[in-house]
Every structure is written in structure tokens, then in C-alpha cells.
């Protein structure tokens, strides 16, 4: 019964939003935005919606819809702003963080973790994946639920997060830069994920061929079992590289680098192993 009441509250609120859209916008635009809102707000906790004035929900919906209109899938889009009634037509006591990105794993958690790392309290998270079609100039042509019949092939993830209000422009710009760096890390790790798993598979196959005489057979089998366990979705591979034994020194093989290790080494000095002298 509680679930039914919650969904009835959601439907009532979205109905009010639909009526407001139809009263203020031309029919085709109102219908497109209403369809977007129905999907975007489908999983948002009702209390996050009912706490807003209808005018603020209307303004937020239009603002997010406008944010979606242009997006190059090869370049993530990040916007951080403080809604102001005079400037945006709606208001909030929070700072809004909006992210539009080609859909892939780890996006929401990575953005949330970065905001938490910066000491920002997250008050609400709204996330939805859309099927989209864009023209050659990256303008939005169609946007639907991925479950819709004949939905476009491309998928984009929209993330909207409300955090503590920050008014310092320099601070907001720094948050935006940091989020771009985090999203770069995500794209790099995800794009190389299959290749990293392939390297682990190759290592397993190599180990299965023979056990070096100086290695205890039980330890050898345990190492193989551990690598196999990692591949069964028990570990998230973010980076990979190899070290070659040259005399009594280990040298990093630059051709083996995958994932986040491919990025600016200055940003990953804490991940880069120094040359190690064996004794």
C-alpha cells in the first residue's frame, strides 16, 4: 500500500508538471519535455520532488532539457550552477551539478565519490540513461527510454546532483575541472577493460604451461586460482602494466601500459612503481 501511495503521488506531481508545460509551451515542445520528464523522474524519490514548488520543478525540468540539446558524445558535458529565479526562472538552496556522458559503467559512483572527496554533502542524485539520436552538429533529434520500441542505438547517461550551495566562482570552476579529470579516468579504464582482462587471461594460460622449479606447486596453483577469481567480476581493473627483468633490475615496459596508467604520469605518480633493484 505504501508503494502504491508513493507512485500515486509521483503520477499526481508529473500530471501537474504536464499541465504546466502544456499551458506555457507550444504543443510539440511540451510533449517532448513531458516524455523526457516522465522517464527522468521515474526513479527519483518522491520526497525529492514534492519538496519543490511546482514552478521550481518546472524551471529545473526546462533547464535540464536545455542542457541535453547539444552534446558531442566524444566529450563529456559538465555544468555547475546555482539556480537563481531572476536568471534561470527557478531557485534552489543547493548547487546543481549536471553531467551528460556516453553511457558506461562507474559514472555515477565516480562523480559522487569525487564530490564527497571535496567535502561536498550530496543532497539528491537523479540519474537516467536515454536512447538518443543527434545530427552531425550534435544537436538532439530524438530522446526516448532505451526500452521504447525503435529506440535509437546511442545511449547517454544524464546525472544531476544537488550539493551544498557554493557561490565562489573559482571553487565551482575547480570542481568542474576535477570532474572532467575523473570522467577522463573512467573513459580510459572502461575503454581498456577488455584488454586488461585479456592480459590476465594470457597470464593464466602462461602459468598453466609450467611451474618454475623454484616455486612451490601449491603456491603456483593458488596464484592461478586467484587470477581466475579476479576475472569473475570480483575486481575492477583500472590500470595495467608490465615490468621486464633486465639483469638484476625491473624495467617498466612502456608498450604494455593500459587503463589509467596511460594517462599523464604526473597525475599517477602514486601508481607508478620505481625501478627496483633486486638483491
Report residues per predicted region:
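Long, intrinsically disordered, low-complexity Ser/Thr/Pro-rich regulatory/activation regions
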Residues: 145-148, 166-167
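Beta-rich nucleic-acid/ligand-interaction surfaces
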Residues: 128-146
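Short, surface-exposed ligand-recognition loops at beta-strand->loop->(often short) alpha-helix junctions
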Residues: 100-106
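Short, well-structured beta-strand/strand-turn elements
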Residues: 119-126
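Charge-rich interaction surfaces and accessory domains that mediate macromolecular binding and assembly
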Residues: 1-92, 96-100, 113-116, 128, ...
Amino acid at each position: 500500500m505504501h508503494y502504491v501511495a508513493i507512485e500515486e503521488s509521483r503520477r499526481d506531481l508529473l500530471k501537474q508538471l504536464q499541465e504546466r508545460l502544456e499551458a506555457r509551451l507550444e504543443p510539440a515542445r511540451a510533449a517532448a519535455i513531458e516524455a523526457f520528464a516522465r522517464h527522468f523522474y521515474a526513479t527519483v524519490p518522491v520526497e525529492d520532488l514534492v519538496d519543490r514548488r511546482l514552478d521550481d520543478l518546472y524551471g529545473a525540468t526546462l533547464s535540464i532539457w536545455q542542457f541535453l540539446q547539444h552534446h558531442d558524445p566524444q566529450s563529456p558535458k559538465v555544468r555547475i550552477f546555482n539556480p537563481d529565479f531572476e536568471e534561470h526562472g527557478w531557485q534552489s538552496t543547493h548547487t546543481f551539478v549536471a553531467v551528460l556522458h556516453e553511457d558506461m559503467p562507474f559514472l555515477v559512483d565516480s562523480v559522487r565519490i569525487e564530490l564527497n572527496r571535496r567535502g561536498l554533502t550530496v543532497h539528491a542524485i537523479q540519474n537516467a540513461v536515454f536512447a538518443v539520436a543527434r545530427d552531425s552538429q550534435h544537436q538532439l533529434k530524438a530522446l526516448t527510454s532505451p526500452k521504447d520500441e525503435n529506440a535509437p542505438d546511442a545511449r547517454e547517461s544524464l546525472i544531476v546532483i544537488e550539493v551544498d550551495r557554493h557561490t565562489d566562482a573559482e571553487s565551482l570552476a575547480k570542481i568542474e575541472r576535477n570532474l572532467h579529470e575523473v570522467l577522463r579516468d573512467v573513459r580510459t579504464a572502461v575503454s581498456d577493460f577488455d584488454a586488461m582482462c585479456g592480459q590476465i587471461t594470457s597470464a593464466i594460460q602462461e602459468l598453466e604451461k609450467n611451474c618454475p622449479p623454484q616455486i612451490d606447486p601449491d603456491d603456483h596453483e593458488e596464484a592461478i586460482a586467484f587470477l581466475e577469481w579476479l576475472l569473475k567480476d570480483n575486481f575492477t581493473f583500472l590500470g595495467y602494466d608490465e615490468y621486464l627483468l633486465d639483469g638484476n633490475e625491473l624495467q617498466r615496459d612502456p608498450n604494455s601500459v593500459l587503463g589509467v596508467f596511460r594517462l599523464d604520469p604526473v597525475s599517477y605518480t602514486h601508481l607508478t612503481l620505481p625501478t627496483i633493484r633486486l638483491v
